[in-house]
Amino acid sequence: MSEPLRIAITKGRLLDDSIRMFQKAGASCSELLDPGRRLVLDVPELGLSAVLAKAPDVVTYVEQGVCALGIVGKDTLMEVGGSFYEVLDLGYGRCRFALAAPRGFSLSARRGTLRIASKYPNVTRSFFRSLGQDVTVIKIEGSVELAPVLGLADAIVDIVETGNTLKANGLEIVSEVAPVSARLIVNTAAMKLRKSEILELTEKCRGVLNA
Amino acid sequence: MTIFKAASPEGTRDKLFAECLRLRGIRSSLMELFSSRSYKEIMTPELEYYDLFVRAENPLPQETMFKLVDRSGRLLVMRPDCTAPIARLVASHFKDAEGPFRLCYDETVFRSAAGLDGADSELPQCGVELIGAPGLRGDIEIVSLAVDAVRSAGLRDFRLELGHADFFFGLTEELGLSREDEEALRACIESRSFALLDELVAGYSGEAAQCLRRLPYLFGGPEILDEAAALTSNPRALAAVERLRDIWRELVSAGRGDCISFDLGLVQGLDYYTGVIFRCWTPGAPSSVLAGGRYDRLLCDFGLELAGAGFAVYVGALASCFECPEPEAAKTLIFYESGCLAEAVALLGGGAELSCFATEAESLEYARRAGMKLLVVSKNGIKEVDPNV
């Protein structure tokens, strides 16, 4: 038996969903459910050893090859980019990127350069580039909905799940930007050097997800 | 000013003794190998005109290039790639010559790293270009030299992966894809985005579409070639598979087949490559340590009807796979009386260094502290002094 494949999993909701998927695939996930002080958590049934990380770090770990695999949201992949294989849409962690603005806002009615606030400046830039519209992007670290309320920006680009937060702040969705869900990513060299193990795992996950 | 005193620019760093030894060792064994195969070294300028790298086929985004402005206001870049300058060199110096020529280089390319991800902006590369050898023999020479290159650098556990541009182009041509869709599809296969690929191909039916859907999985041992050949009847794609098989057979008979694998989904930089494409992977390196292929159109851009093929070894990535011990400190100190410099210098090498002190007593004291033995060279000859007595 070769050494386990190291996988980086995004902490939080994606971790819970990932544990559920692994359990359906036949793993007990006892270490993942109760990490204690351990930093590296084994999932022996699937030949994995997991580390938990913040989403952008998952991408860094996989790109640099210290983890062969990673589970991370498409939102992060779109924002930070990088070079890796994106082999599986895991289907969970579903939400979407949307452009939202105070009621009555219309993209075509405004003249002059729009100011758009977002936690995701790269996603925002490439969305407006695809529309052929030049905008000023303002990076905000949290509570992006505040920006139009305070008059800092005309509209925001953010992750939307239910839309309740938007509504509570008098905002509505102007345009969908992109759907988001969790992805399984693979380091390029690992894919080549450990093909059979990785494909076996992706097939297992695919089987569970389609069940 | 002072805040930058201790820092080097993002993506660059100082390299000290052990790392230098390791890099130097790899570079010299590669260059020795290339020269033994009749590849002649060339050097192109570190600085080039920006325009050289903004031809349509160049896959390098402009923000990755370091730019400068010369006296007359023209835009220059720090060489971001070796092949385009070499194409320029061939086009301007070998206009009327007939191929083949064999060229090799040991240079640094500069690419502005995105920052804070540990990537280097200065990338040492050693590589070869075989110009004017369009056929199978040219492919075989380049691929087998690539195997020998990583071996000569000391790598034992590695995989050289072969693909062919025409497999992908044969299929997309059959589907009649627009340039844009073709690029979207290529990006999908490059990043193995299986889900998105299914979506893109969904509108098409038939053999070529089926085969494209399967393309990201078409990597592995020689059995992949049989699988690929069974999936398509497109003549261009089949010819690509046969070419790979021919290369592989020759390498196997030359004892270089064990490390060869195939990836027909190897579609990076396809704008550049027109035939065989290859990359070398090894455990311990997060990305490939060598990349190359055939680019028969590149020289045409420079007005020369000549085929080209070559590869570059990413020396930095390769070096990171090896441990290298720190160079040893000198064990012997040599103090010489005035007039005996020549005799003292003759004793250097093998871990000896000259004493910088003016007297034998000071030299002795230094040797004691540094744990060295002392040789005293005088007109009467050489005597060894044990500093601990």
Where do the protein language model's features map onto the residues?
Chain B
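Extended alpha-helical scaffolds
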Residues: 152-160, 165-168, 181, 195
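Positively charged, Gly/Ser-enriched RNA/tRNA-binding surfaces
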Residues: 19-37, 48-49, 83-95, 103-155, ...
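Acidic, His- and aromatic-enriched active-site or binding-groove loops in soluble protein domains
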Residues: 64-70, 176-199, 256
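Hydrophobic mid-domain F-helix/FG-region of cytochrome P450s
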Residues: 145-152, 166-176
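Beta-rich nucleic-acid/ligand-interaction surfaces
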Residues: 44-62, 163-173, 266-274, 362-365
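Short, basic, helix/turn surface patches
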Residues: 67-78, 187-190, 378-389
